[in-house]
Structure formats: C-alpha cells, structure tokens
C-alpha cells in the first residue's frame, strides 16, 4: 500500500515543486490550492510565502492566514497534490472559495488522490477549531464534486462568480 503524507513545503522539495508547477503550466491546468505558485518560478519564494501566510505575517488585507500542504508519495518523494486550508473567511471566500483549495497534478488524476488528500486534511481543520468547512467547485467539475461528496459534503447551493464567469457549487463538510 502506498504511503501518502501531508507535509508543509520546504526548500528540500524545490525540484519537486518546480516539476509540479511546470506540469500544470504545460497542461494549461489551473494551480488551485497553492496560492501564487503559478506566478513564482523560484520554489524558495513560494515556500517563504506559505510560511508567512501560515503565521499571518504581513499578509494583504483581502487575504486570510492559511496553511499550505503538499501531498507526497513517500516511495518516490513525488508531490501528487497541494491543499491549502484557510483559517477564516473573507467575503469572497465565504461566498465562493471556502476553507479548502486543492489540486492533483495532471499525470496523477483519476487515481483517488483528491478524495484522500481532502480526507487527510480534516484532522488539521479540527486542530484549527473548524467544526464545519466549506469547499466549493466549479459546477462543471464532476470529479471535484464527487471528491467533496465522498468526504461528506452537503450541498448548500450554487453561486455565480461574475469575474470568472462560472458557477460555484458550495458544500459543507462536518469535521469530526
């Protein structure tokens, strides 16, 4: 059985972070659940960003503290995904984005990793004192909807996001 671990990113993963980022850029796939990684070529810059945001140090007013994890397959050290846990809400996050953002690298999709990473982050949500978390997905993302439902998501409605021109489905998961 594969051993998969949530880890906070650090510079020892620089090559893997670069590879992970590049795979998304090459595939034209959005890098969800990892903040500004798409815009940061230097992994050390991104790691510093994640540390600053977890501490809540010098973050923009329209942002909230968040904890960043990478999801690592221990057998080969490959980053399979990223997940970001937002400690609270801004008005935008409360309406559209939720507590959790995540993605699985394109070459590792459809293997159940998204379901597992969302499940594995729930104990950390509990440590933060979150009793329920809101997770959203674009209404056309069937795989993400299934991931959320498998983890106990309860549908709360669909909202139109005018800037991105998409409908977001909102779900709540009780943290046990």
Regions found by a protein language model. Name each.
Residues 16, 117, 143:
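Charged catalytic carboxylate motif
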Residues 1-99, 164-176:
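GNAT-family acyltransferases
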Residues 71, 122, 130, 158-161:
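Catalytic cores of nucleotide-sugar-dependent glycosyltransferases that transfer UDP/GDP/TDP-activated
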Residues 125-136:
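Conserved GNAT acetyl-CoA-binding A-motif
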Residues 101-104, 110-123, 127, 146-150:
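Conserved acetyl-CoA-binding loop-helix of GNAT-fold acetyltransferases
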Residues 72, 86, 99-110, 138:
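A short, internal acetyl-CoA/4′-phosphopantetheine-binding micro-motif in the GNAT/acyltransferase core
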Residues 136-137, 152-169:
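Conserved catalytic-core motifs of GNAT/GCN5-like acyltransferases
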Residues 135-145:
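Conserved beta-strand-loop-alpha-helix junction that forms the acyl-donor binding cleft
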């Amino acid at each position: 059985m594969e051993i998969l671990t949530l880890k906070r990113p650090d510079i020892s993963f620089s090559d893997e972070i670069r590879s992970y980022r590049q795979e998304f850029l090459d595939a034209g796939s959005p890098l969800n659940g990892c903040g500004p990684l798409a815009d940061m070529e230097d992994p050390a810059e991104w790691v510093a960003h994640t540390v600053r945001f977890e501490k809540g140090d010098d973050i923009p007013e329209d942002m909230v503290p968040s904890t960043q994890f990478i999801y690592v397959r221990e057998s080969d050290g490959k980053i399979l995904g990223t997940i970001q846990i937002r400690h609270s809400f801004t008005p935008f996050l409360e309406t559209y984005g939720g507590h959790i953002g995540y993605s699985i690298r394109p070459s590792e999709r459809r293997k159940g990793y998204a379901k597992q990473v969302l499940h594995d982050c729930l104990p950390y949500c509990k440590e933060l004192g979150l009793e329920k978390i809101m997770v959203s997905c674009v209404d056309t993302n069937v795989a993400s909807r299934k991931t959320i439902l498998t983890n106990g998501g309860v549908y709360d409605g669909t909202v139109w996001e005018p800037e991105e021109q998409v409908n977001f489905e909102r779900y709540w998961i009780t943290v046990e």
